[in-house]
């Protein structure tokens, strides 16, 4: 394998797979990814001051990796109305957040008009305190809500943008392979449907992130296939702001207790995933985010030497990783995030959702 040639050229899906399969050049792959990171984004590591608002944990979905879901009559079930969501957004804004990430479950009661009402209420209550970016509703949520409202995805996205949706999380991607999806999330949108929602979002002027969940039942070929799909979309639309690899948290996942999945990814696979992603995307998707909630502080710091250049957010309220068995907390102060970055010799800079630096 001629790794040095990979620095300059766009590598193929086949070469991407070779990198995942390789067991002899781990540190050379890491070194190449770090060199590319330095060339593309320099030594700045960005972060965002944000809050997660999950407005309900009640969901009709059947995702085998989700431990957050509750049934309507469960004692821990909750459902916030638009006014309650808006109050949480205001609290976040008052404590310095520049972004709120709003997500919920899949229910008949949640349609596009309900989502639009949330956006409207958040804007009304926060606008006198200055702008806050609303990063909300996964592709699955958008599709489900559009169907509940009798709308096309395009119509739904137009309504959401008009009511203040700034950007969307590119979650619900998991692994973009329908065979894998049929096993881990059988009722979730198909690969082609996920692509349809995000490309239409981009065409509507709504930027999205993109993600990949790994360390469950997928094989290396599925990782290469997934990254290839994301790069193709980005070349067509330019609408992805960042790529976020999501390591599978297995402890409380229903699939794990059925003995159908691995014990999550190894630390080596975590780091290799960041590195291969950087080598594959280069500056096509120039921002790669590490997740301190899923990896922990120390491995996240190491990943900053494996191609990543963003450390995510303060996450004032983060419930999903915690429910899945995450043990690294649900909030980190801005000062602690900055200290994490400084400790590895990088320069911390606050950004907004669109990756514009906040001086």
UniProtKB/Swiss-Prot annotation:
Residues that coordinate or bind [4Fe-4S] cluster = 59, 63, 66
Which UniProt keywords are listed?
4Fe-4S, Iron, Iron-sulfur, Metal-binding, S-adenosyl-L-methionine, Transferase
Q: Which Pfam families match?
A: CofH_C, Radical_SAM
- GO MF term (any one): 4 iron, 4 sulfur cluster binding
Gene3D superfamilies cross-referenced by the UniProt entry: Aldolase class I
Pathway membership of this protein?
Cofactor biosynthesis; coenzyme F0 biosynthesis
Give the Radical SAM core domain ranges.
Answer: 45-282
The catalysed reaction is: 5-amino-6-(D-ribitylamino)uracil + L-tyrosine + S-adenosyl-L-methionine = 5-amino-5-(4-hydroxybenzyl)-6-(D-ribitylimino)-5,6-dihydrouracil + 2-iminoacetate + 5'-deoxyadenosine + L-methionine + H(+)
Q: Output the superkingdom of the source species.
A: Archaea
Q: Which cofactor does the UniProt annotation name?
A: [4Fe-4S] cluster
Question: In the Enzyme Commission scheme, what number(s) does this protein have?
Answer: 2.5.1.147
**Known SMART domains for this protein?**
Elp3 (SM00729)
InterPro entries annotated for this entry? Answer: Aldolase_TIM (IPR013785), CofH/MnqC-like_C (IPR045567), CofH_family (IPR019940), Elp3/MiaA/NifB-like_rSAM (IPR006638), F420 (IPR034405), FO_synthase_su2 (IPR020050), rSAM (IPR007197)
Q: Does the keyword Mitochondrion apply?
A: no
Family stated for the protein in its record: Belongs to the radical SAM superfamily. CofH family.
Annotated PANTHER family: FO SYNTHASE (COFH) (PTHR43076), LIPOYL SYNTHASE 2 (PTHR43076:SF1)
* Subunit field text: Consists of two subunits, CofG and CofH.
Q: What does this protein do?
A: Catalyzes the radical-mediated synthesis of 5-amino-5-(4-hydroxybenzyl)-6-(D-ribitylimino)-5,6-dihydrouracil from 5-amino-6-(D-ribitylamino)uracil and L-tyrosine.
What is the designated name of this protein?
A: 5-amino-6-(D-ribitylamino)uracil--L-tyrosine 4-hydroxyphenyl transferase
List the source organism: Methanococcus maripaludis (strain C6 / ATCC BAA-1332)
The record lists the lineage as:
Archaea, Methanobacteriati, Methanobacteriota, Methanomada group, Methanococci
Q: Which gene encodes it?
A: cofH
């Amino acid at each position: 394998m001629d790794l040095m040639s990979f620095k300059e050229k766009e590598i193929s899906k086949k070469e991407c797979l070779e990198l995942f399969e390789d067991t002899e050049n781990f540190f050379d792959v890491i070194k190449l990814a770090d060199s590319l990171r330095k060339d593309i984004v320099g030594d700045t590591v960005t972060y965002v001051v944000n809050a997660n608002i999950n407005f309900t944990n009640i969901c009709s979905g059947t995702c085998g990796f989700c431990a957050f879901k509750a049934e309507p009559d469960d004692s821990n079930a909750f459902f916030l109305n638009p006014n309650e969501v808006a109050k949480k957004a205001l609290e976040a804004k008052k404590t310095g957040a520049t972004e709120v990430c709003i997500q919920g479950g899949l229910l008949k009661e949640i349609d596009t008009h309900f989502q639009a009402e949330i956006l409207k209420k958040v804007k009304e209550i926060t606008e006198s305190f200055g702008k806050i970016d609303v990063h909300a509703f996964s592709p699955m949520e958008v599709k489900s809500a559009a169907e509940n409202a009798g709308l096309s995805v395009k119509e739904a996205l137009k309504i959401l943008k008009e009511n203040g949706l700034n950007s969307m999380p590119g979650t619900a991607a998991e692994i973009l392979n329908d065979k894998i999806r049929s096993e881990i999330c059988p009722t979730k949108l198909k690969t082609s449907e996920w692509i349809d929602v995000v490309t239409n979002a981009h065409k509507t002027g709504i930027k999205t992130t993109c993600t990949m969940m790994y360390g469950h039942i997928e094989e290396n070929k599925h990782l290469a296939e997934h990254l290839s799909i994301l790069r193709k979309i980005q070349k067509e639309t330019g609408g992805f702001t960042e790529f976020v690899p999501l390591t599978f948290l297995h402890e409380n996942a229903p699939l794990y207790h059925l003995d159908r999945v691995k014990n999550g990814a190894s630390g080596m696979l975590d780091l290799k995933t960041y590195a291969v992603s950087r080598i594959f995307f280069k500056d096509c998707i120039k921002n790669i985010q590490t997740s301190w909630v899923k990896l922990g502080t120390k491995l996240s710091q190491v990943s900053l030497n494996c191609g990543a250049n963003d450390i995510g957010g303060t996450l004032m309220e983060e419930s999903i990783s915690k429910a899945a068995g995450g043990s690294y907390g649900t909030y980190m102060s801005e000062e602690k995030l900055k200290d994490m970055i400084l400790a590895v010799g990088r320069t911390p800079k606050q950004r907004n959702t669109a990756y514009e630096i906040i001086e």
